[in-house]
Amino acid sequence: MSSPDQDPREAIAQGDDEVIDVRRGMFGAAGTGDTSGYGRLVRTVTLPGSSPRPYGSYFDDVVDTLTESLQSNGIEFHQAIEKVVVYRDELTLHVDRAALPHVAQHLRDDPRLRFEMCLGVSGVHYPHETGRELHAVYPLQSITHNRRVRLEVAVPDEDPHIPSLYRIYPTTDWHERETYDFFGIVFDGHPSLTRIEMPDDWHGHPQRKDYPLGGIPVEYKGAQIPPPDERRAYN
Protein backbone atom coordinates (compact mmCIF):
# COMPACT_ATOMS: atom_id res chain seq x y z
CA MET A 1 0.00 0.00 0.00
CA SER A 2 1.31 3.44 -0.85
CA SER A 3 1.78 6.19 1.74
CA PRO A 4 -0.13 9.51 1.44
CA ASP A 5 3.08 11.32 0.45
CA GLN A 6 4.11 8.79 -2.17
CA ASP A 7 3.90 9.61 -5.85
CA PRO A 8 0.91 7.50 -7.04
CA ARG A 9 2.87 6.47 -10.12
CA GLU A 10 5.45 4.83 -7.85
CA ALA A 11 2.79 2.73 -6.09
CA ILE A 12 3.15 0.19 -8.91
CA ALA A 13 6.45 -1.45 -8.05
CA GLN A 14 8.83 -3.00 -10.52
CA GLY A 15 7.90 -6.64 -10.89
CA ASP A 16 9.68 -9.81 -11.95
CA ASP A 17 8.54 -11.71 -15.01
CA GLU A 18 5.47 -13.82 -14.26
CA VAL A 19 5.78 -17.55 -14.96
CA ILE A 20 2.45 -18.82 -16.29
CA ASP A 21 3.40 -22.19 -17.78
CA VAL A 22 6.20 -24.69 -18.39
CA ARG A 23 6.05 -26.39 -21.76
CA ARG A 24 7.85 -29.63 -22.47
CA GLY A 25 8.80 -31.22 -25.76
CA MET A 26 7.79 -30.35 -29.30
CA PHE A 27 4.33 -29.88 -30.74
CA GLY A 28 2.73 -33.27 -30.19
CA ALA A 29 6.05 -34.98 -29.39
CA ALA A 30 4.86 -36.52 -26.12
CA GLY A 31 4.56 -40.29 -26.41
CA THR A 32 6.00 -40.43 -29.93
CA GLY A 33 9.13 -42.06 -31.25
CA ASP A 34 10.94 -38.72 -31.48
CA THR A 35 14.72 -39.24 -31.48
CA SER A 36 15.75 -35.69 -32.40
CA GLY A 37 16.19 -34.55 -28.81
CA TYR A 38 13.57 -31.86 -29.16
CA GLY A 39 11.13 -34.01 -27.23
CA ARG A 40 13.11 -33.22 -24.08
CA LEU A 41 12.90 -29.44 -24.46
CA VAL A 42 11.65 -27.57 -21.41
CA ARG A 43 10.54 -23.98 -21.98
CA THR A 44 9.29 -21.60 -19.33
CA VAL A 45 6.48 -19.32 -20.51
CA THR A 46 6.62 -15.88 -18.88
CA LEU A 47 4.83 -12.56 -19.12
CA PRO A 48 6.85 -9.37 -18.50
CA GLY A 49 6.53 -7.73 -15.09
CA SER A 50 6.15 -4.04 -14.30
CA SER A 51 8.87 -1.86 -15.85
CA PRO A 52 10.99 0.58 -13.82
CA ARG A 53 11.20 4.32 -14.38
CA PRO A 54 12.23 6.01 -16.58
CA TYR A 55 10.30 4.22 -19.31
CA GLY A 56 11.97 6.09 -22.14
CA SER A 57 10.70 7.76 -25.32
CA TYR A 58 7.34 9.52 -24.83
CA PHE A 59 6.13 6.81 -22.45
CA ASP A 60 6.83 8.77 -19.24
CA ASP A 61 4.92 11.75 -20.58
CA VAL A 62 1.89 9.58 -21.42
CA VAL A 63 1.85 7.96 -17.97
CA ASP A 64 2.34 11.30 -16.15
CA THR A 65 -0.39 13.01 -18.16
CA LEU A 66 -2.81 10.11 -17.71
CA THR A 67 -2.12 10.17 -13.97
CA GLU A 68 -3.03 13.87 -13.76
CA SER A 69 -6.08 13.42 -15.97
CA LEU A 70 -7.43 10.54 -13.89
CA GLN A 71 -6.76 12.35 -10.61
CA SER A 72 -8.71 15.36 -11.85
CA ASN A 73 -11.76 13.06 -11.81
CA GLY A 74 -10.99 11.44 -8.47
CA ILE A 75 -9.42 8.27 -9.87
CA GLU A 76 -6.04 7.19 -8.49
CA PHE A 77 -3.62 5.88 -11.09
CA HIS A 78 -2.64 2.77 -9.11
CA GLN A 79 -6.31 1.86 -8.64
CA ALA A 80 -6.98 1.93 -12.39
CA ILE A 81 -3.65 0.62 -13.71
CA GLU A 82 -2.38 -2.73 -12.45
CA LYS A 83 1.05 -2.42 -14.04
CA VAL A 84 2.98 -0.49 -16.68
CA VAL A 85 5.05 -2.61 -19.06
CA VAL A 86 7.58 -1.44 -21.63
CA TYR A 87 8.53 -4.43 -23.75
CA ARG A 88 10.18 -4.39 -27.15
CA ASP A 89 9.78 -0.60 -27.34
CA GLU A 90 6.01 -0.75 -26.80
CA LEU A 91 4.06 0.74 -23.89
CA THR A 92 1.30 -1.43 -22.40
CA LEU A 93 -0.99 -0.35 -19.58
CA HIS A 94 -2.59 -3.28 -17.77
CA VAL A 95 -5.97 -1.89 -16.73
CA ASP A 96 -8.42 -3.01 -14.08
CA ARG A 97 -11.53 -3.99 -16.03
CA ALA A 98 -13.86 -1.75 -14.00
CA ALA A 99 -11.66 1.25 -14.83
CA LEU A 100 -11.28 0.46 -18.55
CA PRO A 101 -13.95 2.90 -19.86
CA HIS A 102 -12.59 5.72 -17.67
CA VAL A 103 -9.00 5.15 -18.80
CA ALA A 104 -10.02 4.95 -22.47
CA GLN A 105 -12.14 8.11 -22.17
CA HIS A 106 -9.25 10.10 -20.69
CA LEU A 107 -6.80 8.79 -23.27
CA ARG A 108 -9.16 9.86 -26.04
CA ASP A 109 -10.41 13.21 -24.75
CA ASP A 110 -7.49 14.80 -22.90
CA PRO A 111 -5.92 17.20 -25.45
CA ARG A 112 -2.45 16.32 -24.16
CA LEU A 113 -3.07 12.65 -25.00
CA ARG A 114 -5.62 12.52 -27.84
CA PHE A 115 -5.56 8.82 -28.63
CA GLU A 116 -8.37 9.24 -31.13
CA MET A 117 -8.28 5.81 -32.73
CA CYS A 118 -8.62 2.26 -31.45
CA LEU A 119 -7.04 -0.02 -34.04
CA GLY A 120 -8.84 -3.18 -32.97
CA VAL A 121 -9.37 -5.71 -30.19
CA SER A 122 -7.36 -8.91 -29.82
CA GLY A 123 -8.18 -11.83 -27.58
CA VAL A 124 -5.53 -13.97 -25.87
CA HIS A 125 -6.00 -17.17 -23.89
CA TYR A 126 -3.51 -18.21 -21.20
CA PRO A 127 -5.15 -21.33 -19.73
CA HIS A 128 -2.52 -21.71 -16.99
CA GLU A 129 -2.67 -18.12 -15.71
CA THR A 130 -5.12 -18.93 -12.94
CA GLY A 131 -7.78 -16.28 -12.43
CA ARG A 132 -6.57 -14.27 -15.45
CA GLU A 133 -6.99 -16.75 -18.28
CA LEU A 134 -8.58 -14.41 -20.83
CA HIS A 135 -7.00 -11.16 -22.01
CA ALA A 136 -8.34 -8.42 -24.28
CA VAL A 137 -5.79 -6.12 -25.91
CA TYR A 138 -6.58 -2.69 -27.38
CA PRO A 139 -3.92 -0.86 -29.48
CA LEU A 140 -4.61 2.90 -29.46
CA GLN A 141 -3.20 5.47 -31.89
CA SER A 142 -2.82 9.22 -31.40
CA ILE A 143 -2.93 10.80 -34.83
CA THR A 144 -2.45 14.25 -33.27
CA HIS A 145 0.77 13.37 -31.42
CA ASN A 146 1.90 10.35 -33.50
CA ARG A 147 2.00 8.06 -30.47
CA ARG A 148 0.81 4.58 -29.63
CA VAL A 149 -0.19 2.85 -26.42
CA ARG A 150 -1.71 -0.53 -25.74
CA LEU A 151 -4.35 -1.34 -23.11
CA GLU A 152 -4.64 -4.87 -21.77
CA VAL A 153 -7.36 -6.28 -19.52
CA ALA A 154 -7.37 -9.74 -17.91
CA VAL A 155 -10.43 -11.64 -16.63
CA PRO A 156 -11.05 -15.17 -15.32
CA ASP A 157 -12.72 -17.97 -17.24
CA GLU A 158 -15.50 -18.05 -14.65
CA ASP A 159 -16.36 -14.37 -15.13
CA PRO A 160 -15.31 -13.36 -18.67
CA HIS A 161 -16.95 -9.92 -18.63
CA ILE A 162 -15.28 -6.67 -19.79
CA PRO A 163 -17.00 -3.31 -20.33
CA SER A 164 -17.46 -2.58 -24.03
CA LEU A 165 -15.58 0.38 -25.50
CA TYR A 166 -18.07 0.75 -28.35
CA ARG A 167 -19.46 4.05 -27.00
CA ILE A 168 -15.97 5.53 -26.79
CA TYR A 169 -14.42 3.90 -29.86
CA PRO A 170 -17.16 2.80 -32.31
CA THR A 171 -14.48 1.07 -34.40
CA THR A 172 -14.41 -1.70 -31.78
CA ASP A 173 -17.89 -2.86 -32.85
CA TRP A 174 -16.99 -5.84 -35.04
CA HIS A 175 -13.67 -6.43 -33.24
CA GLU A 176 -15.44 -7.03 -29.93
CA ARG A 177 -17.90 -9.34 -31.66
CA GLU A 178 -15.03 -11.33 -33.19
CA THR A 179 -13.24 -11.57 -29.83
CA TYR A 180 -16.47 -12.78 -28.24
CA ASP A 181 -16.97 -15.28 -31.07
CA PHE A 182 -13.49 -16.79 -30.88
CA PHE A 183 -12.57 -16.41 -27.19
CA GLY A 184 -15.85 -16.10 -25.29
CA ILE A 185 -15.11 -12.70 -23.73
CA VAL A 186 -18.41 -10.93 -23.03
CA PHE A 187 -18.30 -7.19 -23.69
CA ASP A 188 -20.95 -5.69 -21.45
CA GLY A 189 -22.84 -2.82 -23.05
CA HIS A 190 -22.14 -3.80 -26.65
CA PRO A 191 -25.30 -3.07 -28.68
CA SER A 192 -25.23 -6.30 -30.71
CA LEU A 193 -22.87 -8.89 -29.23
CA THR A 194 -23.51 -11.83 -31.54
CA ARG A 195 -21.23 -14.20 -33.41
CA ILE A 196 -19.67 -12.65 -36.48
CA GLU A 197 -17.86 -15.54 -38.21
CA MET A 198 -19.04 -18.81 -36.69
CA PRO A 199 -22.68 -19.95 -37.10
CA ASP A 200 -25.10 -18.65 -34.48
CA ASP A 201 -25.68 -22.17 -33.13
CA TRP A 202 -21.96 -23.01 -32.81
CA HIS A 203 -20.77 -24.36 -29.46
CA GLY A 204 -17.51 -23.15 -27.97
CA HIS A 205 -14.91 -20.58 -28.97
CA PRO A 206 -12.43 -21.89 -31.56
CA GLN A 207 -9.32 -19.80 -30.75
CA ARG A 208 -9.12 -20.82 -27.11
CA LYS A 209 -6.22 -23.16 -26.39
CA ASP A 210 -8.52 -25.71 -24.76
CA TYR A 211 -10.65 -25.99 -27.91
CA PRO A 212 -10.30 -29.36 -29.75
CA LEU A 213 -8.37 -29.19 -33.00
CA GLY A 214 -9.80 -30.01 -36.41
CA GLY A 215 -12.32 -32.36 -37.88
CA ILE A 216 -15.49 -30.38 -37.18
CA PRO A 217 -17.37 -29.28 -40.31
CA VAL A 218 -18.73 -25.74 -40.18
CA GLU A 219 -22.33 -25.58 -41.38
CA TYR A 220 -24.39 -22.45 -41.81
CA LYS A 221 -27.79 -24.09 -41.64
CA GLY A 222 -30.51 -22.51 -43.74
CA ALA A 223 -28.33 -19.56 -44.64
CA GLN A 224 -29.62 -17.35 -47.42
CA ILE A 225 -27.71 -14.41 -48.85
CA PRO A 226 -30.07 -11.49 -49.56
CA PRO A 227 -29.34 -8.90 -52.24
CA PRO A 228 -26.95 -6.12 -51.10
CA ASP A 229 -29.67 -3.51 -50.61
CA GLU A 230 -31.55 -5.82 -48.22
CA ARG A 231 -28.69 -7.01 -46.03
CA ARG A 232 -28.91 -5.99 -42.43
CA ALA A 233 -26.66 -3.24 -41.17
CA TYR A 234 -24.73 -3.68 -37.93
CA ASN A 235 -25.26 -0.50 -35.96
Swiss-Prot record:
Membrane-protein topology: Peripheral membrane protein
One example GO MF annotation: NADH dehydrogenase (ubiquinone) activity
Alphabetically ordered keywords of this record: Cell membrane, Membrane, NAD, Quinone, Translocase, Transport
Reaction it catalyzes: a quinone + NADH + 5 H(+)(in) = a quinol + NAD(+) + 4 H(+)(out)
Cell compartment(s), UniProt: Cell membrane
GO cellular component: plasma membrane
Pfam families: Complex1_30kDa
EC nos: 7.1.1.-
Gene3D superfamilies reported for this sequence: NADH:ubiquinone oxidoreductase, 30kDa subunit
SUPFAM superfamilies reported in the protein's UniProt record: Nqo5-like
Family (UniProt): Belongs to the complex I 30 kDa subunit family.
Function: NDH-1 shuttles electrons from NADH, via FMN and iron-sulfur (Fe-S) centers, to quinones in the respiratory chain. The immediate electron acceptor for the enzyme in this species is believed to be a menaquinone. Couples the redox reaction to proton translocation (for every two electrons transferred, four hydrogen ions are translocated across the cytoplasmic membrane), and thus conserves the redox energy in a proton gradient.
Quaternary structure note: NDH-1 is composed of 14 different subunits. Subunits NuoB, C, D, E, F, and G constitute the peripheral sector of the complex.
Protein name stated in the entry: NADH-quinone oxidoreductase subunit C
